[in-house]
Structures are given as structure tokens and as C-alpha cells.
């Protein structure tokens, strides 16, 4: 089950718990977080966590709502798991891009 995180302390707590239990953590942004917090904020959060918790297995899913532009920006910034609920044609194009950069696009 994914843990919804909206701050660095929340993400750290979830990863510390996963680290102590020896399991992988599934982190997920709140709905429409790319619009609310910004893609760059979550990209920096992801980079900080990858550095701080280098030995801990985790995924971070950024919810981009129906905004294809934000989903594309998230892929450009290196976020590896994007939630997108927009137009099916946009989803197909984004999925193709995600595959090329080793990322994953998931529906809502």
C-alpha cells in the first residue's frame, strides 16, 4: 500500500520505516500534486531521497492529474513513475516517452 507524502519529513519517515522493516516503500503524491506543488519540487524531493536513502528501495509516484504538460515535464526531470488521467491519446504519447526514458505512466 502506498504512503501519501507531501513533504520531505513525511517521505523520510516512510523511508525510515521501510528501511527498518527491510521492505520497499511506495510513496505517492497527493492528487494533482504536480499542479499544486510543482514538478520541480517533487523532482528535487526525489533526488534528495535517492541520495539520502541510496540503499533503500522505493518508488515515488507523482500525480499529474489530466495535465499532459506537467506529466511530460516530470519525465524530463527524471521522475520515474507518473500518474496521468488525461486524454487517451496524450496518455499513449506520454507512455511512449516514459518507456524511452525508463519511466512508467500509470492511470488514475
Question: What are the functions of these language-model segments?
Answer:
Residues 66-69, 81, 89-90:
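A short acidic, glycine/proline-enriched capping/turn motif at secondary-structure boundaries
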Residues 1-23, 74:
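Short, charged N-terminal helix-start/capping segments
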Residues 29-75:
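N-terminal active-site wall of soluble small-molecule enzyme domains
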Residues 71-82, 96-104:
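Amphipathic protein-protein interaction modules
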